Amino acid sequence: MFTLKKSMLLLFFLGTISLSLCEEERNADEDDGEKEVKRGIFALIKTAAKFVGKNLLKQAGKAGLEHLACKANNQC
């Protein structure tokens, strides 16, 4: 009877340790995934800002050139 209790206690102890190791590994994997998502969102925002900025500068440049041409030809 005593050896059965020792065996059960040993199995419980080993199961608890393996469960805690699995949980730690799962938590580590989840943390890495969040960092990748954050990087992905930041890259998306950065790319969108570059695109919008480039288009705004093009439009401003065209408007500025048209205004200068208008002033130069006195057609305003």
Curated annotation (Swiss-Prot):
Annotated GO biological process: defense response to bacterium; defense response to fungus; innate immune response; killing of cells of another organism
Pfam families attached to this UniProt entry: FSAP_sig_propep
Disulfide cross-links: 70-76
InterPro entries according to UniProt: Frog_antimicrobial_propeptide
GO CC list: extracellular region
UniProt entry tagged with the keyword Signal: yes
Subcellular location per the Swiss-Prot or TrEMBL entry: Secreted
The entry's keywords: Amphibian defense peptide, Antibiotic, Antimicrobial, Cleavage on pair of basic residues, Disulfide bond, Fungicide, Immunity, Innate immunity, Secreted, Signal
Protein name: Esculentin-2-ALa
Organism of origin: Amolops loloensis
Lineage: Eukaryota, Metazoa, Chordata, Craniata, Vertebrata
